[in-house]
């Protein structure tokens, strides 16, 4: 039972809210048809979505990440389930892991080129320390921006849906009930669109960070 608007963001509301996404995830992983075809599907998506017929590990990783986020976003839209993409800790862990791997890989492969990104070419010598500081801060807050963007957008959608459901359930005898339901269905479809857009933005930002890799 949802006691307030923020109950949908609490993963401890019930065991069912955790079991449903976990069961569906395990089913997708162990399903024989999916297991046989997933490699070809990932290769096709990586080639078609990134405008290149060649298959490489980076594009495959980005495609898998986008599919994973979309899958969990859509699971969170199901009634009485907990969407892990609304969890600050889950998203922060994911963002820190990916950002850290990109950063660490760059410094291991070519420390000089990685450090060169901190100092814009042609910058005045007097402004160089200040520019290096700004660039360092912008790099350090990247996991935070990835996390906040995804959590805020998905959580706001769940809260608004809970608010609309609460209003509808308290006005069942209202003459404008059909209009209210129509508005809620329209917003629900909009939230499905947001699920895809947020996954795309998260992956797009990761690809931009990877482009800075030496």
UniProtKB/Swiss-Prot annotation:
Gene Ontology CC: one annotated term: proton-transporting ATP synthase complex
Domain of life: Eukaryota
UniProt subcellular location: Mitochondrion inner membrane
InterPro entries membership: ATP_synth_F0_asu (IPR000568), ATP_synth_F0_asu_AS (IPR023011), ATP_synth_F0_asu_bact/mt (IPR045083), F0_ATP_A_sf (IPR035908)
Transmembrane annotation, as ranges: 9-29, 64-84, 88-108, 121-141, 150-170, 182-202
Disulfide bonds: none
Any one Gene Ontology molecular-function term assigned to this protein's record: proton-transporting ATP synthase activity, rotational mechanism
UniProt membrane topology term: Multi-pass membrane protein
Similarity comment: Belongs to the ATPase A chain family.
Subunit composition and interactions: F-type ATPases have 2 components, CF(1) - the catalytic core - and CF(0) - the membrane proton channel. CF(1) has five subunits: alpha(3), beta(3), gamma(1), delta(1), epsilon(1). CF(0) has three main subunits: a, b and c.
Function text: Mitochondrial membrane ATP synthase (F(1)F(0) ATP synthase or Complex V) produces ATP from ADP in the presence of a proton gradient across the membrane which is generated by electron transport complexes of the respiratory chain. F-type ATPases consist of two structural domains, F(1) - containing the extramembraneous catalytic core and F(0) - containing the membrane proton channel, linked together by a central stalk and a peripheral stalk. During catalysis, ATP synthesis in the catalytic domain of F(1) is coupled via a rotary mechanism of the central stalk subunits to proton translocation.
Protein name: ATP synthase subunit a
Organism the protein comes from: Albinaria caerulea (Land snail)
């Amino acid at each position: 039972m949802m006691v307030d608007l923020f109950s949908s963001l609490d993963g401890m509301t019930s065991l069912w809210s955790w079991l449903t996404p976990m069961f569906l995830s395990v089913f997708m992983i162990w399903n024989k048809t999916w297991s046989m075809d997933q490699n070809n599907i990932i290769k096709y998506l990586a080639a078609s979505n990134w405008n290149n017929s060649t298959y490489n590990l980076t594009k495959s990783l980005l495609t898998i990440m986008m599919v994973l986020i979309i899958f969990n976003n859509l699971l969170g839209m199901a009634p009485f389930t907990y969407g892990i993409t609304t969890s600050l800790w889950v998203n922060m862990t994911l963002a820190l892991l990916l950002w850290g791997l990109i950063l660490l890989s760059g410094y291991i492969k070519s420390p000089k080129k990685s450090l060169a990104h901190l100092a814009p070419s042609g910058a005045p010598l007097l402004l160089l320390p200040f520019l290096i500081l700004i660039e360092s801060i912008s790099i350090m807050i990247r996991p935070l921006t990835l996390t906040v963007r995804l959590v805020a957008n998905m959580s706001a959608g769940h809260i608004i849906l809970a608010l609309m459901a609460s209003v509808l359930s308290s006005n069942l005898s209202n003459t404008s009930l059909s209009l209210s339901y129509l508005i809620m269905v329209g917003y629900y479809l909009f939230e499905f669109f947001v699920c895809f857009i947020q996954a795309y933005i998260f992956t797009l930002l990761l690809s931009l960070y990877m482009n800075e890799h030496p």
